[in-house]
Amino acid sequence: MASTVPSTMKAWQFSSASPTIEANLKLNNNAPLPDGANNLGPDQVLVKVIAAGLNPVDFKFAEIPWLGRLIVGSPSTPGMDFAGRVVATGPNTKSVAVEDLKPGQLVFGRLDSPSKFGTLAEYTIAPRKGCVAIPPGARVIETACVASVGLTAYQSIVYRLKDHTGKRIFLNGGSGGCGTFGIQIAKQMGCHVTTSCSTPNVDLCRSLGADTVIDYKKTDVIAELKKMQPFDLVVDNVGVPTDLYWAAPSFTNPGAPYVQVGALAVTPGFILGNFFKARWPGWLGGGKRPWEFMHIESNVQDYEQLGRWMQEGKLRAVVDEVFGMQDDGPVKAYQKLRTGRAKGKIIVKIDETWED
């Protein structure tokens, strides 16, 4: 490995998350490689990153006062999603029941959590369960944005209903990363999909297969939902309207799961509100529909299903913009991501020589 991996790498790093990580992001041309890069542990994969997909969790955890630094470390490189090429693999313990990846193989995937050594760097170490071969014919750059939102959308829909055909799903927020994948996945499973978005994104959501689109700029989302047949599942990708969950009994069937994916901010009030939704008895003012905050678990088989759909043309990544590694590209990328107005995903091209 010593002959193929340099002693240092280029990486975007921040040492403070106040007021934001992008206000402190700097390109380090001589950053150390991830810990263990030359001595990989069991089921670890060293990846030379071609592109990184950005997610709000990249900055939301890091920006939690005091706690963020403990979770992520400092200095830190943000980013969890990637597309790249395998450099080396650690011993395979067979805990992941798949074939070994080979050096040189193109892969996409995600890290398990925000890390000091994230994916906005030339090299990253991924868990084997979070790394899968890129299917033939897929655009490598686009696969960089699939793992987190694709897996979130897949598990929030596929795992929550036993029988999907004909089931009615409401996806709150259809034009972002999770929403664009969620619409397509729900349709693949045979569901009837209603989603919400702003006026400029209505046509996008319809083009992805949404049966009904609520324009929240023109109408009240909850009022519109109450006029429709009751839903069997709600996936909330945005966290607004803030009273959407409490209104759910008026537009969902009894027992319909409510899956919280997105939130405006992780605040003490948000955490307390979630406690009442999840734990407080309904007869004492708590939630009257099963509520959970979405937690995804990397699963090679799920990634492979997403890859098959992409290969078959049944699932596509909606990419808002691809930024470069140089000239403050990542800074501008996070600034745009933070607006919440991106159509689909934002990608940073780490290897700027790569062409699909």
Swiss-Prot record:
Binding site for NADP(+): 57-60, 175-178, 198-201, 216, 261-262, 342-343
CDD domains the UniProt entry points to: MDR1 (cd08267)
SMART domains hit by this protein: PKS_ER (SM00829)
Top EC group: oxidoreductase
Gene3D superfamilies attached to this UniProt entry: Medium-chain alcohol dehydrogenases, catalytic domain (3.90.180.10), NAD(P)-binding Rossmann-like Domain (3.40.50.720)
Keywords noted in UniProt: NADP, Nucleotide-binding, Oxidoreductase
Triggers of expression: Expression is significantly up-regulated at the end of late growth phase, in the presence of Butyrolactone I. Expression is positively regulated by the pgm cluster-specific transcription factor pgmR.
EC number: 1.-.-.-
Annotated knockout phenotype: Does not affect the production of the naphthoquinones derived pigments.
Pfam families xref list: ADH_N (PF08240), ADH_zinc_N_2 (PF13602)
Molecular functions (GO terms): nucleotide binding; oxidoreductase activity
GO cellular component: mitochondrion
Recorded superkingdom: Eukaryota
Family (UniProt): Belongs to the zinc-containing alcohol dehydrogenase family.
Physiological role: FAD-linked oxidoreductase; part of the gene cluster that mediates the biosynthesis of pleosporalin A, ascomycone A, as well as a third cryptic naphthoquinone derived pigment, all responsible for the coloration of conidia. The pathway begins with the biosynthesis of the cyclized heptaketide 3-acetonyl-1,6,8-trihydroxy-2-naphthaldehyde by the NR-PKS pgmA.
Protein name: Trans-enoyl reductase pgmF
Organism: Aspergillus terreus
Lineage: Eukaryota, Fungi, Dikarya, Ascomycota, Pezizomycotina
